Amino acid sequence: MGCWGRNRGRLLCMLLLTFMFMVLEVVVSRVTASLAMLSDSFHMLSDVLALVVALVAERFARRTHATQKNTFGWIRAEVMGALVNAIFLTGLCFAILLEAVERFIEPHEMQQPLVVLSVGVAGLLVNVLGLCLFHHHSGEGQGAGHGHSHGHGHGHLAKGARKAGRAGGEAGAPPGRAPDQEPDQEETNTLVANTSNSNGLKADQAEPEKLRSDDPVDVQVNGNLIQESDSLESEDNRAGQLNMRGVFLHVLGDALGSVIVVVNALVFYFSWKGCTEDDFCVNPCFPDPCKSSVELMNSTQAPMHEAGPCWVLYLDPTLCIIMVCILLYTTYPLLKESALILLQTVPKQIDIKHLVKELRDVEGVEEVHELHVWQLAGSRIIATAHIKCEDPASYMQVAKTIKDVFHNHGIHATTIQPEFASVGSKSSVVPCELACRTQCALKQCCGTRPQVHSGKEAEKAPTVSISCLELSENLEKKPRRTKAEGSVPAVVIEIKNVPNKQPESSL
Protein backbone atom coordinates (compact mmCIF):
# COMPACT_ATOMS: atom_id res chain seq x y z
CA MET A 1 0.00 0.00 0.00
CA GLY A 2 2.90 2.31 0.75
CA CYS A 3 4.47 1.74 -2.64
CA TRP A 4 1.12 2.31 -4.32
CA GLY A 5 0.74 5.59 -2.43
CA ARG A 6 4.20 6.75 -3.50
CA ASN A 7 3.66 5.81 -7.14
CA ARG A 8 0.21 7.38 -7.16
CA GLY A 9 1.54 10.68 -5.77
CA ARG A 10 4.35 10.78 -8.31
CA LEU A 11 2.01 9.99 -11.18
CA LEU A 12 -0.52 12.65 -10.16
CA CYS A 13 2.18 15.30 -9.73
CA MET A 14 3.73 14.49 -13.09
CA LEU A 15 0.32 14.35 -14.76
CA LEU A 16 -0.57 17.87 -13.62
CA LEU A 17 2.76 19.38 -14.70
CA THR A 18 2.74 17.55 -18.03
CA PHE A 19 -0.78 18.63 -18.95
CA MET A 20 -0.13 22.30 -18.15
CA PHE A 21 3.12 22.35 -20.06
CA MET A 22 1.59 20.52 -23.03
CA VAL A 23 -0.95 23.32 -23.50
CA LEU A 24 1.84 25.92 -23.31
CA GLU A 25 3.98 24.13 -25.90
CA VAL A 26 1.10 23.74 -28.36
CA VAL A 27 0.42 27.49 -28.27
CA VAL A 28 4.08 28.51 -28.55
CA SER A 29 4.84 26.02 -31.34
CA ARG A 30 2.03 27.44 -33.46
CA VAL A 31 3.17 31.01 -32.88
CA THR A 32 6.87 30.39 -33.54
CA ALA A 33 6.54 27.67 -36.25
CA SER A 34 8.92 25.35 -34.37
CA LEU A 35 8.69 21.71 -35.43
CA ALA A 36 10.82 20.55 -32.52
CA MET A 37 8.47 22.18 -30.02
CA LEU A 38 5.40 20.89 -31.84
CA SER A 39 6.75 17.34 -31.75
CA ASP A 40 7.61 17.80 -28.09
CA SER A 41 4.05 18.97 -27.40
CA PHE A 42 2.69 15.87 -29.14
CA HIS A 43 4.97 13.81 -26.98
CA MET A 44 3.63 15.63 -23.93
CA LEU A 45 0.12 14.65 -25.03
CA SER A 46 1.25 11.05 -25.27
CA ASP A 47 2.70 11.38 -21.78
CA VAL A 48 -0.64 12.59 -20.44
CA LEU A 49 -2.33 9.51 -21.87
CA ALA A 50 0.48 7.29 -20.60
CA LEU A 51 0.21 8.67 -17.08
CA VAL A 52 -3.55 8.15 -17.09
CA VAL A 53 -3.05 4.56 -18.25
CA ALA A 54 -0.40 4.05 -15.56
CA LEU A 55 -2.74 5.38 -12.86
CA VAL A 56 -5.55 3.08 -13.97
CA ALA A 57 -3.19 0.11 -14.23
CA GLU A 58 -1.74 0.78 -10.78
CA ARG A 59 -5.25 1.01 -9.36
CA PHE A 60 -6.37 -2.29 -10.87
CA ALA A 61 -3.10 -4.03 -10.02
CA ARG A 62 -3.78 -3.46 -6.31
CA ARG A 63 -6.68 -5.92 -6.60
CA THR A 64 -4.51 -8.98 -6.12
CA HIS A 65 -7.21 -11.00 -4.33
CA ALA A 66 -8.35 -13.91 -6.44
CA THR A 67 -12.05 -13.98 -7.24
CA GLN A 68 -14.17 -16.54 -9.00
CA LYS A 69 -14.14 -14.33 -12.09
CA ASN A 70 -10.45 -13.37 -12.01
CA THR A 71 -8.53 -16.20 -10.41
CA PHE A 72 -5.25 -14.29 -10.77
CA GLY A 73 -6.71 -10.94 -9.76
CA TRP A 74 -5.75 -7.91 -11.87
CA ILE A 75 -2.01 -8.45 -11.57
CA ARG A 76 -1.56 -8.26 -15.36
CA ALA A 77 -3.18 -4.82 -15.60
CA GLU A 78 0.22 -3.17 -15.28
CA VAL A 79 1.66 -5.32 -18.05
CA MET A 80 -1.24 -4.25 -20.24
CA GLY A 81 -0.60 -0.62 -19.30
CA ALA A 82 3.06 -0.96 -20.24
CA LEU A 83 2.08 -2.38 -23.64
CA VAL A 84 -0.38 0.46 -24.27
CA ASN A 85 2.27 3.03 -23.32
CA ALA A 86 4.79 1.47 -25.67
CA ILE A 87 2.27 1.45 -28.53
CA PHE A 88 1.39 5.11 -27.90
CA LEU A 89 5.06 6.07 -27.96
CA THR A 90 5.76 4.07 -31.12
CA GLY A 91 2.82 5.64 -32.95
CA LEU A 92 3.96 9.09 -31.86
CA CYS A 93 7.45 8.43 -33.22
CA PHE A 94 6.07 7.65 -36.67
CA ALA A 95 3.91 10.81 -36.59
CA ILE A 96 6.97 12.94 -35.78
CA LEU A 97 8.95 11.17 -38.51
CA LEU A 98 6.36 12.10 -41.15
CA GLU A 99 6.37 15.72 -39.98
CA ALA A 100 10.18 15.82 -40.18
CA VAL A 101 10.15 14.48 -43.76
CA GLU A 102 7.69 17.22 -44.70
CA ARG A 103 10.02 19.83 -43.19
CA PHE A 104 12.87 18.54 -45.33
CA ILE A 105 10.75 19.15 -48.42
CA GLU A 106 9.42 22.54 -47.30
CA PRO A 107 11.71 24.11 -44.67
CA HIS A 108 10.28 26.77 -42.37
CA GLU A 109 12.02 29.63 -40.63
CA MET A 110 11.66 29.74 -36.85
CA GLN A 111 9.99 32.83 -35.41
CA GLN A 112 11.06 34.32 -32.06
CA PRO A 113 13.78 31.81 -31.16
CA LEU A 114 14.25 33.36 -27.70
CA VAL A 115 10.67 32.42 -26.77
CA VAL A 116 11.30 28.89 -28.00
CA LEU A 117 14.52 28.77 -25.98
CA SER A 118 12.85 29.86 -22.74
CA VAL A 119 9.99 27.39 -23.13
CA GLY A 120 12.45 24.61 -23.95
CA VAL A 121 14.49 25.31 -20.82
CA ALA A 122 11.33 25.28 -18.69
CA GLY A 123 10.26 21.99 -20.26
CA LEU A 124 13.68 20.51 -19.60
CA LEU A 125 13.38 21.42 -15.92
CA VAL A 126 9.97 19.73 -15.72
CA ASN A 127 11.31 16.59 -17.35
CA VAL A 128 14.37 16.51 -15.10
CA LEU A 129 11.95 16.62 -12.16
CA GLY A 130 10.08 13.68 -13.68
CA LEU A 131 13.32 11.74 -14.16
CA CYS A 132 14.12 12.30 -10.50
CA LEU A 133 10.69 10.95 -9.54
CA PHE A 134 10.95 7.80 -11.67
CA HIS A 135 14.72 7.24 -11.89
CA HIS A 136 14.54 3.98 -9.87
CA HIS A 137 12.46 2.44 -12.69
CA SER A 138 15.01 3.28 -15.37
CA GLY A 139 16.56 -0.05 -16.38
CA GLU A 140 15.38 -2.83 -14.14
CA GLY A 141 15.09 -6.06 -16.05
CA GLN A 142 11.84 -7.67 -15.07
CA GLY A 143 11.52 -11.38 -14.65
CA ALA A 144 15.19 -12.01 -15.30
CA GLY A 145 16.02 -12.90 -11.73
CA HIS A 146 15.16 -15.83 -9.55
CA GLY A 147 13.48 -14.48 -6.48
CA HIS A 148 13.10 -16.75 -3.46
CA SER A 149 10.32 -14.86 -1.75
CA HIS A 150 7.07 -16.76 -2.09
CA GLY A 151 3.83 -16.86 -0.24
CA HIS A 152 1.28 -16.86 -3.00
CA GLY A 153 -0.59 -20.11 -3.19
CA HIS A 154 -3.87 -21.62 -4.18
CA GLY A 155 -5.01 -25.19 -4.14
CA HIS A 156 -7.09 -27.09 -6.66
CA LEU A 157 -9.02 -30.01 -5.22
CA ALA A 158 -9.32 -33.20 -7.13
CA LYS A 159 -12.71 -34.72 -7.63
CA GLY A 160 -11.87 -37.48 -5.19
CA ALA A 161 -10.86 -34.93 -2.57
CA ARG A 162 -14.12 -33.04 -2.97
CA LYS A 163 -16.09 -36.27 -2.56
CA ALA A 164 -14.19 -37.11 0.58
CA GLY A 165 -14.93 -33.64 1.94
CA ARG A 166 -18.63 -34.06 1.36
CA ALA A 167 -18.55 -37.40 3.18
CA GLY A 168 -17.10 -35.76 6.26
CA GLY A 169 -13.49 -36.74 5.67
CA GLU A 170 -10.50 -34.55 5.02
CA ALA A 171 -8.66 -34.77 1.75
CA GLY A 172 -4.94 -34.30 1.97
CA ALA A 173 -2.75 -32.12 -0.15
CA PRO A 174 0.89 -32.64 -0.90
CA PRO A 175 2.83 -31.98 2.26
CA GLY A 176 4.35 -28.54 2.19
CA ARG A 177 6.50 -26.59 4.57
CA ALA A 178 5.81 -25.86 8.17
CA PRO A 179 3.71 -22.82 9.11
CA ASP A 180 6.75 -20.98 10.34
CA GLN A 181 8.24 -21.32 6.86
CA GLU A 182 5.25 -19.82 5.11
CA PRO A 183 7.14 -16.96 3.39
CA ASP A 184 9.18 -19.57 1.51
CA GLN A 185 6.18 -21.66 0.55
CA GLU A 186 5.69 -22.64 -3.05
CA GLU A 187 2.44 -22.88 -4.91
CA THR A 188 2.33 -26.48 -6.05
CA ASN A 189 -0.97 -28.05 -7.00
CA THR A 190 -1.49 -31.73 -7.67
CA LEU A 191 -4.64 -33.37 -8.90
CA VAL A 192 -4.31 -36.37 -6.57
CA ALA A 193 -5.51 -36.36 -2.98
CA ASN A 194 -3.46 -38.02 -0.26
CA THR A 195 -6.05 -39.49 2.07
CA SER A 196 -3.46 -40.45 4.66
CA ASN A 197 -2.66 -36.84 5.44
CA SER A 198 -4.93 -35.41 8.12
CA ASN A 199 -3.74 -31.85 7.74
CA GLY A 200 -4.95 -31.30 4.21
CA LEU A 201 -7.30 -29.25 2.13
CA LYS A 202 -10.86 -29.00 3.34
CA ALA A 203 -13.60 -29.12 0.80
CA ASP A 204 -15.75 -26.06 0.47
CA GLN A 205 -19.33 -26.91 1.44
CA ALA A 206 -20.81 -23.51 0.59
CA GLU A 207 -23.67 -23.46 -1.86
CA PRO A 208 -22.65 -22.28 -5.34
CA GLU A 209 -25.50 -19.80 -5.62
CA LYS A 210 -24.35 -18.00 -2.49
CA LEU A 211 -20.93 -17.33 -3.94
CA ARG A 212 -20.48 -14.25 -6.05
CA SER A 213 -17.84 -13.75 -8.69
CA ASP A 214 -16.43 -10.70 -6.92
CA ASP A 215 -16.01 -12.39 -3.54
CA PRO A 216 -12.38 -13.06 -2.64
CA VAL A 217 -11.41 -16.71 -2.51
CA ASP A 218 -9.73 -17.88 0.70
CA VAL A 219 -6.88 -20.21 -0.10
CA GLN A 220 -5.73 -22.97 2.21
CA VAL A 221 -2.55 -24.95 1.76
CA ASN A 222 -1.93 -27.81 4.20
CA GLY A 223 -4.81 -26.54 6.32
CA ASN A 224 -3.30 -23.07 6.81
CA LEU A 225 -4.87 -19.91 5.43
CA ILE A 226 -2.47 -18.03 3.21
CA GLN A 227 -2.48 -14.31 3.98
CA GLU A 228 -1.02 -11.36 2.12
CA SER A 229 2.59 -11.16 3.26
CA ASP A 230 5.50 -8.82 2.74
CA SER A 231 6.94 -11.24 0.21
CA LEU A 232 3.71 -11.09 -1.79
CA GLU A 233 3.81 -7.30 -1.75
CA SER A 234 7.38 -7.40 -3.00
CA GLU A 235 6.22 -9.65 -5.85
CA ASP A 236 3.50 -7.13 -6.71
CA ASN A 237 6.03 -4.32 -6.63
CA ARG A 238 8.29 -6.17 -9.05
CA ALA A 239 5.32 -6.80 -11.31
CA GLY A 240 4.49 -3.09 -11.29
CA GLN A 241 8.00 -2.04 -12.36
CA LEU A 242 7.19 -2.79 -16.00
CA ASN A 243 4.37 -0.26 -16.05
CA MET A 244 6.42 2.39 -14.23
CA ARG A 245 9.30 1.74 -16.60
CA GLY A 246 7.01 2.72 -19.46
CA VAL A 247 6.27 5.99 -17.68
CA PHE A 248 10.00 6.58 -17.21
CA LEU A 249 10.62 6.07 -20.93
CA HIS A 250 7.95 8.64 -21.73
CA VAL A 251 9.57 11.16 -19.40
CA LEU A 252 12.99 10.37 -20.87
CA GLY A 253 11.62 10.98 -24.34
CA ASP A 254 10.25 14.33 -23.18
CA ALA A 255 13.65 15.26 -21.77
CA LEU A 256 15.31 14.44 -25.09
CA GLY A 257 12.71 16.52 -26.89
CA SER A 258 13.36 19.47 -24.60
CA VAL A 259 17.11 19.19 -25.19
CA ILE A 260 16.50 19.20 -28.94
CA VAL A 261 14.28 22.29 -28.62
CA VAL A 262 16.97 24.14 -26.63
CA VAL A 263 19.80 23.17 -29.00
CA ASN A 264 17.79 24.08 -32.06
CA ALA A 265 16.77 27.45 -30.63
CA LEU A 266 20.38 28.31 -29.65
CA VAL A 267 21.79 27.35 -33.06
CA PHE A 268 19.07 29.25 -34.89
CA TYR A 269 19.48 32.36 -32.75
CA PHE A 270 23.27 32.61 -33.19
CA SER A 271 23.70 31.21 -36.74
CA TRP A 272 20.69 32.24 -38.78
CA LYS A 273 20.76 35.59 -40.59
CA GLY A 274 17.28 36.36 -41.68
CA CYS A 275 15.74 39.14 -43.71
CA THR A 276 14.65 42.39 -42.12
CA GLU A 277 11.70 44.51 -43.15
CA ASP A 278 13.84 47.48 -44.28
CA ASP A 279 16.21 45.58 -46.57
CA PHE A 280 15.60 43.81 -49.84
CA CYS A 281 16.39 40.16 -49.13
CA VAL A 282 16.09 36.84 -50.88
CA ASN A 283 15.92 33.48 -49.14
CA PRO A 284 17.58 30.79 -51.29
CA CYS A 285 16.52 28.08 -48.85
CA PHE A 286 12.89 28.18 -49.91
CA PRO A 287 11.69 26.12 -52.90
CA ASP A 288 11.35 28.98 -55.48
CA PRO A 289 13.75 31.84 -54.72
CA CYS A 290 14.22 32.90 -58.36
CA LYS A 291 10.77 34.40 -58.82
CA SER A 292 11.00 36.64 -55.78
CA SER A 293 14.54 37.81 -56.62
CA VAL A 294 13.58 38.70 -60.22
CA GLU A 295 10.63 40.76 -59.01
CA LEU A 296 12.81 42.60 -56.51
CA MET A 297 15.53 43.33 -59.07
CA ASN A 298 13.00 44.72 -61.53
CA SER A 299 11.34 46.96 -58.98
CA THR A 300 14.43 48.61 -57.51
CA GLN A 301 18.18 48.88 -57.86
CA ALA A 302 18.79 48.65 -54.09
CA PRO A 303 21.44 46.19 -52.82
CA MET A 304 20.19 42.68 -52.22
CA HIS A 305 20.76 40.61 -49.07
CA GLU A 306 20.68 36.84 -48.84
CA ALA A 307 19.35 34.90 -45.83
CA GLY A 308 21.15 31.89 -44.53
CA PRO A 309 22.86 29.59 -43.97
CA CYS A 310 20.35 27.04 -45.18
CA TRP A 311 21.65 24.15 -43.09
CA VAL A 312 20.16 25.80 -40.00
CA LEU A 313 16.65 25.21 -41.36
CA TYR A 314 17.38 21.50 -41.82
CA LEU A 315 18.77 21.13 -38.32
CA ASP A 316 15.28 21.07 -36.80
CA PRO A 317 13.96 18.01 -38.71
CA THR A 318 17.34 16.27 -38.46
CA LEU A 319 17.33 16.50 -34.66
CA CYS A 320 13.72 15.28 -34.65
CA ILE A 321 14.70 12.16 -36.60
CA ILE A 322 17.55 11.51 -34.15
CA MET A 323 15.08 11.82 -31.27
CA VAL A 324 12.72 9.36 -32.99
CA CYS A 325 15.52 6.81 -33.38
CA ILE A 326 16.47 7.12 -29.71
CA LEU A 327 12.86 6.75 -28.60
CA LEU A 328 12.29 3.69 -30.77
CA TYR A 329 15.51 2.14 -29.48
CA THR A 330 14.45 2.61 -25.85
CA THR A 331 10.80 1.65 -26.43
CA TYR A 332 11.36 -1.58 -28.35
CA PRO A 333 12.53 -3.65 -25.33
CA LEU A 334 9.47 -2.55 -23.31
CA LEU A 335 7.12 -3.31 -26.21
CA LYS A 336 8.70 -6.71 -26.79
CA GLU A 337 8.76 -7.72 -23.12
CA SER A 338 5.16 -6.76 -22.38
CA ALA A 339 3.90 -8.35 -25.60
CA LEU A 340 5.71 -11.63 -24.91
CA ILE A 341 4.25 -11.76 -21.39
CA LEU A 342 0.72 -11.31 -22.72
CA LEU A 343 1.39 -13.93 -25.40
CA GLN A 344 2.38 -16.31 -22.58
CA THR A 345 5.68 -17.31 -24.12
CA VAL A 346 8.33 -19.13 -22.14
CA PRO A 347 10.39 -16.58 -20.15
CA LYS A 348 13.83 -15.99 -21.62
CA GLN A 349 15.61 -17.11 -18.45
CA ILE A 350 13.94 -20.56 -18.57
CA ASP A 351 15.74 -23.25 -20.58
CA ILE A 352 12.77 -25.46 -21.43
CA LYS A 353 14.89 -28.29 -22.89
CA HIS A 354 17.05 -28.48 -19.79
CA LEU A 355 13.92 -28.37 -17.60
CA VAL A 356 12.32 -31.30 -19.45
CA LYS A 357 15.56 -33.27 -19.20
CA GLU A 358 15.75 -32.73 -15.44
CA LEU A 359 12.12 -33.73 -14.98
CA ARG A 360 12.60 -36.94 -16.97
CA ASP A 361 15.72 -37.76 -14.97
CA VAL A 362 13.74 -37.76 -11.72
CA GLU A 363 13.51 -41.27 -10.31
CA GLY A 364 10.01 -42.63 -10.72
CA VAL A 365 9.07 -40.41 -13.69
CA GLU A 366 8.40 -42.32 -16.89
CA GLU A 367 7.25 -39.52 -19.17
CA VAL A 368 6.66 -35.74 -19.17
CA HIS A 369 4.25 -34.13 -21.60
CA GLU A 370 1.88 -31.14 -21.85
CA LEU A 371 4.53 -28.98 -20.15
CA HIS A 372 3.63 -25.29 -20.30
CA VAL A 373 5.63 -22.47 -18.74
CA TRP A 374 4.61 -18.82 -18.88
CA GLN A 375 5.09 -15.57 -17.01
CA LEU A 376 2.12 -14.03 -15.23
CA ALA A 377 3.75 -10.69 -14.31
CA GLY A 378 7.05 -9.58 -12.89
CA SER A 379 8.89 -12.62 -11.52
CA ARG A 380 5.76 -14.77 -11.16
CA ILE A 381 6.29 -17.77 -13.41
CA ILE A 382 3.70 -20.54 -13.69
CA ALA A 383 4.09 -24.08 -14.99
CA THR A 384 1.73 -26.99 -15.65
CA ALA A 385 2.70 -30.51 -16.65
CA HIS A 386 1.46 -34.07 -17.03
CA ILE A 387 3.80 -36.42 -15.16
CA LYS A 388 3.55 -40.14 -15.84
CA CYS A 389 4.63 -42.22 -12.83
CA GLU A 390 4.90 -45.89 -12.05
CA ASP A 391 2.40 -46.18 -9.20
CA PRO A 392 0.46 -43.94 -6.78
CA ALA A 393 2.42 -45.16 -3.75
CA SER A 394 5.64 -43.41 -4.75
CA TYR A 395 4.01 -40.37 -6.31
CA MET A 396 4.19 -38.03 -3.30
CA GLN A 397 7.95 -38.42 -3.04
CA VAL A 398 8.24 -37.89 -6.80
CA ALA A 399 6.09 -34.75 -6.51
CA LYS A 400 8.45 -33.29 -3.90
CA THR A 401 11.43 -33.85 -6.17
CA ILE A 402 9.59 -32.35 -9.13
CA LYS A 403 8.72 -29.33 -7.01
CA ASP A 404 12.40 -28.82 -6.18
CA VAL A 405 13.31 -29.03 -9.87
CA PHE A 406 10.81 -26.30 -10.73
CA HIS A 407 12.01 -24.23 -7.78
CA ASN A 408 15.62 -24.39 -8.98
CA HIS A 409 14.48 -22.96 -12.31
CA GLY A 410 12.66 -20.05 -10.64
CA ILE A 411 9.16 -21.52 -11.08
CA HIS A 412 7.19 -21.46 -7.85
CA ALA A 413 3.57 -21.80 -9.02
CA THR A 414 3.14 -25.28 -10.46
CA THR A 415 0.22 -27.57 -11.23
CA ILE A 416 1.06 -31.23 -11.77
CA GLN A 417 -1.38 -33.74 -13.22
CA PRO A 418 -0.17 -37.25 -12.37
CA GLU A 419 -0.72 -40.20 -14.66
CA PHE A 420 -0.06 -43.77 -13.60
CA ALA A 421 1.00 -46.39 -16.10
CA SER A 422 -1.52 -49.11 -16.84
CA VAL A 423 -0.57 -52.76 -16.52
CA GLY A 424 1.53 -53.78 -19.50
CA SER A 425 1.56 -50.32 -21.09
CA LYS A 426 4.71 -48.59 -22.25
CA SER A 427 5.37 -44.87 -22.41
CA SER A 428 6.37 -45.10 -26.05
CA VAL A 429 3.13 -46.84 -27.02
CA VAL A 430 0.68 -44.91 -24.84
CA PRO A 431 2.25 -41.49 -24.15
CA CYS A 432 -0.84 -40.12 -22.40
CA GLU A 433 -2.90 -42.23 -20.01
CA LEU A 434 -5.61 -39.54 -19.81
CA ALA A 435 -5.96 -38.54 -23.43
CA CYS A 436 -8.71 -36.22 -24.60
CA ARG A 437 -11.59 -37.38 -26.76
CA THR A 438 -11.22 -36.96 -30.50
CA GLN A 439 -13.66 -34.05 -30.69
CA CYS A 440 -11.54 -31.97 -28.31
CA ALA A 441 -8.06 -33.29 -29.11
CA LEU A 442 -7.35 -30.50 -31.59
CA LYS A 443 -8.46 -27.88 -29.05
CA GLN A 444 -5.72 -28.73 -26.59
CA CYS A 445 -2.77 -26.42 -26.07
CA CYS A 446 -0.42 -28.74 -27.94
CA GLY A 447 -2.99 -30.37 -30.26
CA THR A 448 -2.63 -34.12 -30.60
CA ARG A 449 -2.68 -34.27 -34.38
CA PRO A 450 -1.79 -37.53 -36.15
CA GLN A 451 1.71 -37.76 -37.57
CA VAL A 452 1.95 -36.72 -41.22
CA HIS A 453 3.66 -39.22 -43.51
CA SER A 454 5.06 -38.45 -46.92
CA GLY A 455 5.56 -40.52 -50.08
CA LYS A 456 5.27 -44.28 -49.83
CA GLU A 457 5.02 -44.12 -46.05
CA ALA A 458 1.61 -42.45 -46.40
CA GLU A 459 0.27 -45.46 -48.33
CA LYS A 460 1.58 -47.99 -45.83
CA ALA A 461 0.80 -46.10 -42.65
CA PRO A 462 -2.83 -46.53 -41.57
CA THR A 463 -4.68 -43.55 -40.17
CA VAL A 464 -5.66 -44.23 -36.56
CA SER A 465 -7.38 -41.62 -34.41
CA ILE A 466 -8.68 -42.98 -31.13
CA SER A 467 -8.38 -41.82 -27.57
CA CYS A 468 -7.81 -43.79 -24.39
CA LEU A 469 -11.37 -43.15 -23.23
CA GLU A 470 -12.90 -44.36 -26.51
CA LEU A 471 -10.72 -47.45 -26.43
CA SER A 472 -11.90 -48.33 -22.95
CA GLU A 473 -15.54 -47.74 -23.94
CA ASN A 474 -15.23 -50.03 -26.97
CA LEU A 475 -13.59 -52.75 -24.90
CA GLU A 476 -16.34 -52.66 -22.31
CA LYS A 477 -18.98 -53.48 -24.95
CA LYS A 478 -19.63 -57.17 -25.59
CA PRO A 479 -18.55 -58.28 -29.06
CA ARG A 480 -21.31 -59.36 -31.43
CA ARG A 481 -20.72 -62.36 -33.61
CA THR A 482 -22.16 -62.41 -37.10
CA LYS A 483 -22.81 -65.41 -39.32
CA ALA A 484 -19.62 -64.83 -41.23
CA GLU A 485 -17.68 -64.95 -37.99
CA GLY A 486 -19.13 -68.29 -36.90
CA SER A 487 -15.89 -70.15 -37.49
CA VAL A 488 -13.73 -67.46 -35.89
CA PRO A 489 -13.31 -67.78 -32.13
CA ALA A 490 -14.28 -64.65 -30.26
CA VAL A 491 -11.84 -63.02 -27.88
CA VAL A 492 -13.55 -61.28 -25.00
CA ILE A 493 -11.60 -58.76 -22.97
CA GLU A 494 -13.06 -58.09 -19.58
CA ILE A 495 -12.14 -54.97 -17.67
CA LYS A 496 -12.73 -55.16 -13.97
CA ASN A 497 -13.03 -51.97 -11.99
CA VAL A 498 -10.93 -52.44 -8.89
CA PRO A 499 -11.98 -49.81 -6.36
CA ASN A 500 -9.51 -47.78 -4.30
CA LYS A 501 -6.56 -49.05 -6.33
CA GLN A 502 -5.93 -45.85 -8.27
CA PRO A 503 -7.09 -42.42 -7.16
CA GLU A 504 -9.37 -40.54 -9.46
CA SER A 505 -7.88 -37.63 -11.37
CA SER A 506 -9.68 -34.62 -12.70
CA LEU A 507 -8.85 -33.09 -16.07
UniProtKB/Swiss-Prot annotation:
Annotated residues that bind Zn(2+) are located at 43, 47, 250, 254
Known regulation of activity: Calcium-dependent.
- In-chain residues carrying the UniProt-annotated modification Phosphoserine: 506
Cellular component (GO) terms are: basolateral plasma membrane; cytoplasm; cytoplasmic vesicle membrane; dendrite; endoplasmic reticulum; endoplasmic reticulum membrane; glutamatergic postsynaptic density; Golgi apparatus
Q: Which residues lie on this side of the membrane: Cytoplasmic?
A: 1-10, 57-78, 135-247, 329-507
Q: What are the start and end residues of every segment in region (Disordered)?
A: 140-218
Query: Which tissues show it?
Result: Widely expressed. Detected in duodenum and jejunum but not in ileum and colon (at protein level). Expressed by neuroglial cells (at protein level).
Q: Which reaction does it catalyse?
A: Zn(2+)(in) + 2 H(+)(out) = Zn(2+)(out) + 2 H(+)(in)
Amino acid composition bias (Basic residues), ranges on this chain: 147-165
The annotated region (6 X 2 AA approximate repeats of H-G) lies at: 145-156
* InterPro entries attached to this UniProt entry: Cation_efflux, Cation_efflux_CTD_sf, Cation_efflux_TMD_sf
Q: How does it sit in the membrane?
A: Multi-pass membrane protein
Q: What triggers its expression?
A: Slightly by zinc in the intestine, but not the liver.
UniProt keyword terms in alphabetical order: Antiport, Cell membrane, Cytoplasm, Cytoplasmic vesicle, Endoplasmic reticulum, Glycoprotein, Golgi apparatus, Ion transport, Membrane, Metal-binding, Nucleus, Phosphoprotein, Repeat, Transmembrane, Transmembrane helix, Transport, Zinc, Zinc transport
Where found, per UniProt?
Cell membrane; Basolateral cell membrane; Cytoplasmic vesicle membrane; Cytoplasm
Chain ranges sitting on the Extracellular side read 32-35, 100-113, 269-307
Described purpose of this protein according to its UniProt entry: Zinc ion:proton antiporter that could function at the plasma membrane mediating zinc efflux from cells against its electrochemical gradient protecting them from intracellular zinc accumulation and toxicity. Alternatively, could prevent the transport to the plasma membrane of CACNB2, the L-type calcium channels regulatory subunit, through a yet to be defined mechanism. By modulating the expression of these channels at the plasma membrane, could prevent calcium and zinc influx into cells. By the same mechanism, could also prevent L-type calcium channels-mediated heavy metal influx into cells.
NCBIfam families (UniProt xref): CDF
This chain belongs to the protein called Proton-coupled zinc antiporter SLC30A1
Q: Report the gene name.
A: Slc30a1
